[in-house]
């Protein structure tokens, strides 16, 4: 899979074109509880998403738990989302990857995570990191906790399809 990477907010109009050209009308927007607003991502992205049906999912722990993933998958399915946009740090991007990985899962998601099983997931994933350093926007890995035990899911299909690196989004993050 070829990943497209753009730098700077000036490239954001491509986001709208990308969604339209991929026939994505309903989007699951995965964000941090506060970072989406504090980073200026919300005000920057809003004009580019106003012609789409957007469902925001931000009610999950900083270290994603399997229950959070299952809830996210249910929201994605119930709202009939066609694409995922992740705006946040490593945990947010991991959550979006996991929702992508298991949104078509017919089985027990916990068992599939433990066995590193990722089914067919052709849903487009767009990443806009608000932190520098996790590198999650460039990798095929995602971390989730099941019963306080850490599991890593790895599959090439989890690498975001499109990435926007916007330096202003990182200005509100802590130095640590």
Task: Name the predicted role of every residue range.
Residues 1-83:
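ATP/NTP phosphate-donor binding region
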Residues 81-99, 130-136:
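Glycine/serine-rich anion-binding loops at beta->alpha junctions
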Residues 104-176:
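A glycine/threonine-rich phosphate-anchoring loop and its flanking beta-alpha core
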Residues 4, 26-28, 55, 82-85, ...:
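Structural motif
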Residues 44-45, 73, 92-106, 138-141:
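Short Gly/Thr/Asp-enriched flexible loops that form oxyanion-binding sites at enzyme active sites
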Residues 39-42, 69, 96, 137-138, ...:
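Conserved strand-to-helix beginnings and helix N-cap segments that scaffold or border functional pockets
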Residues 20, 24, 50, 74-78, ...:
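Generic secondary-structure signature for well-ordered alpha-helical cores
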């Amino acid at each position: 899979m070829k990943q497209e990477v753009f730098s700077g907010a000036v490239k954001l109009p491509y986001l709208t074109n990308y969604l339209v050209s991929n026939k994505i009308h309903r989007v699951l927007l995965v964000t941090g509880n506060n970072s989406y607003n504090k980073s200026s991502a919300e005000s920057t992205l809003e004009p580019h998403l106003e012609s789409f049906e957007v469902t925001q999912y931000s009610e999950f722990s900083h270290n994603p738990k399997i229950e959070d993933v299952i809830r996210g998958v249910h929201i994605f399915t119930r709202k009939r989302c066609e694409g995922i946009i992740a705006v946040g740090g490593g945990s947010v991007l991991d959550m979006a990857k996991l929702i992508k990985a298991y949104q078509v899962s017919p089985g027990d998601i916990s068992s599939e995570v433990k066995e590193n099983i990722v089914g067919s997931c052709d849903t487009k994933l767009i990443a806009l990191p608000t932190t520098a350093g996790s590198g999650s926007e460039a990798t095929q890995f995602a971390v989730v906790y099941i019963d306080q035990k850490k599991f890593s899911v790895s599959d090439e299909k989890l690498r975001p399809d499109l990435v926007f690196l916007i330096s202003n989004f990182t200005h509100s993050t802590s130095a640590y």
